[in-house]
């Protein structure tokens, strides 16, 4: 059977990514990471992307209510090995425990930019003009 050459994640990568996301969320909710910056910040994990070999998990996080996202991301990456160790009980079925890497999730900012562009007067004028042409 030939391997797929597409860059889309496989069902297995998506399933494992969701399991890792849930496990990291539980570790953070229970307050197991003893770092004041992490303990005092609400952290939203929007997605975890797995490498094809399932050995690297990249977690996209958004620290809420904090101006300095980079400091929170740095603190999470500093404690990544500890967090990886705490994932073990919830991910027993995995042959290898993935290395966890944290990245800032910029997708919400991108959505806001697109929304503001769509609401701009120039774009709404063009959309109105297109609607008039169709009639």
From Swiss-Prot:
Compartments (UniProt record): Cytoplasm
Pfam families, A to Z: RBFA (PF02033)
Record key words, sorted: Cytoplasm, Ribosome biogenesis
Location (main, coarse): cytoplasm
InterPro entries reported for this sequence: KH_dom-like_a/b, RbfA, RbfA_dom_sf, Ribosome-bd_factorA_CS
GO biological process, one term: maturation of SSU-rRNA
GO molecular-function terms, A-Z: ribosomal small subunit binding
GO cellular component, one term: cytosol
Top-rank lineage group of the source organism: Bacteria
Function: One of several proteins that assist in the late maturation steps of the functional core of the 30S ribosomal subunit. Associates with free 30S ribosomal subunits (but not with 30S subunits that are part of 70S ribosomes or polysomes). Required for efficient processing of 16S rRNA. May interact with the 5'-terminal helix region of 16S rRNA.
Subunit structure: Monomer. Binds 30S ribosomal subunits, but not 50S ribosomal subunits or 70S ribosomes.
Family the UniProt entry places it in: Belongs to the RbfA family.
Protein name: Ribosome-binding factor A
Gene behind this protein: rbfA
């Amino acid at each position: 059977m030939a391997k797929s050459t597409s860059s889309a994640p496989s069902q297995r990568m998506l399933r494992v990514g969701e399991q890792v996301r849930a496990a990291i969320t539980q570790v953070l909710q229970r307050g197991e990471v003893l770092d004041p910056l992490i303990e005092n910040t609400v952290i939203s994990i929007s997605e975890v992307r797995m490498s094809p070999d399932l050995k690297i998990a990249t977690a996209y996080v958004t620290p809420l209510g904090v101006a300095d996202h980079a400091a929170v991301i740095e603190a999470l990456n500093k404690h990544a090995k500890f967090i990886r160790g705490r994932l073990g009980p919830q991910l027993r079925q995995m042959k290898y425990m993935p290395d966890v890497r944290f990245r800032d999730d910029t997708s919400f900012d991108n959505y806001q930019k697109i929304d503001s562009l769509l609401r701009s007067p120039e774009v709404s004028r063009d959309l109105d003009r297109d609607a008039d042409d169709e009639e």
